């Protein structure tokens, strides 16, 4: 059994590729079923966010394993293998464990130390438990990563400053508009990222917020908290002209805001500028919008320059966190190796007990037939000894014949011989 982590993220692939490799919530179960149908896959977890798509797998080793999994991923998303191969990373066993721990701790995020990723990893794990996990080692790896993430956040200052994609989006808005108190902001979506954006905006005295979402109930709860108006996604076209700032983050597989929609809004606004911040993957705003005069479109990748200014104080904490991850990953792999030994021990004990029961049954039968008790017991002891030492004796003899002193010493040590 081998543990694997493979995928792409914001460091290896542009948003144009990442949006083609995402797994939407609506198709996740189907994807997991398809993944587990692969003969080499024992269990799997799919993590798909705006910045990464990753598969965490427990697999049986086989020839061309990497090729088979890349082919599955490309076939599922109708991708050319060459388009994906150069952006794909592949981690195995200890490296896979370390990678997951780093991801869960925010050490591999676009925003170093951001806390939202832990919730996303936990959700991915929970989704996989609906009949798709099927591997105790994989489950233990995820549970361990959660405790490591908690330890990193508790024992280091990795989360000391309020830095996130949501924070960066608000920072961008404050850089472009002198005061946010007089602008109208349209938020598209009502997920965790938009919740954070809404709270940041409220802290910066935004008076007018509109939340557009597919389900009104979720949006209404957030609107009640931040004092916003709620509209449906179908109302965006009519209300876009009211917004000075649009920040969008949904799980829609297709763009929600098109070039024509923005053109109409700009005309109604008499070309008063609009800021559009698209932090969704796949993108919510058609890229062509960025070519329009007075429409200033930023994607999640464009936020990197803003985010980089807020990282300095987290670098020292990241070094401490990496040490914790290295230690915890090493301990996990030691536990995993011990599980392999435990199975061997169980098999050896079962084999020995089977020999014991077989010979004891024969001895009891002989006693019941009136045989000499002392002779029967001596015969039992002799046969039991010979049967139990038969396999170790053959291994010792073979090691001696091969001149394999290292193996001979290991066998002597295993048998308790000085």
Swiss-Prot record:
Active site, renumbered: 50
Binding site for NADP(+): 189-194
Reaction catalyzed: (S)-4-amino-5-oxopentanoate + tRNA(Glu) + NADP(+) = L-glutamyl-tRNA(Glu) + NADPH + H(+)
Ranges annotated as spanning the membrane: none
Pathway: Porphyrin-containing compound metabolism; protoporphyrin-IX biosynthesis; 5-aminolevulinate from L-glutamyl-tRNA(Glu): step 1/2
Site (Important for activity): 99
Pfam families assigned to the protein according to its UniProt record, in alphabetical order: GlutR_dimer, GlutR_N, Shikimate_DH
Domain of life of the organism encoding this protein: Bacteria
Assigned EC number: 1.2.1.70
Molecular function GO labels: glutamyl-tRNA reductase activity; NADP binding
Alphabetical keyword list: NADP, Oxidoreductase, Porphyrin biosynthesis
UniProt-annotated binding residues for substrate: 49-52, 109, 114-116, 120
Top-level EC class as recorded in UniProt: oxidoreductase
Gene3D superfamilies: Glutamyl-tRNA reductase, N-terminal domain, NAD(P)-binding Rossmann-like Domain
Single biological process term from Gene Ontology: protoporphyrinogen IX biosynthetic process from glutamate
Record function comment: Catalyzes the NADPH-dependent reduction of glutamyl-tRNA(Glu) to glutamate 1-semialdehyde (GSA).
Other comments on record: During catalysis, the active site Cys acts as a nucleophile attacking the alpha-carbonyl group of tRNA-bound glutamate with the formation of a thioester intermediate between enzyme and glutamate, and the concomitant release of tRNA(Glu). The thioester intermediate is finally reduced by direct hydride transfer from NADPH, to form the product GSA.
Self-association and partners: Homodimer.
Domain note: Possesses an unusual extended V-shaped dimeric structure with each monomer consisting of three distinct domains arranged along a curved 'spinal' alpha-helix. The N-terminal catalytic domain specifically recognizes the glutamate moiety of the substrate. The second domain is the NADPH-binding domain, and the third C-terminal domain is responsible for dimerization.
HAMAP family for this protein: Glu_tRNA_reductase
Family: Belongs to the glutamyl-tRNA reductase family.
Name the record gives this protein: Glutamyl-tRNA reductase
Organism of provenance: Salmonella arizonae (strain ATCC BAA-731 / CDC346-86 / RSK2980)
Gene assigned in the entry: hemA
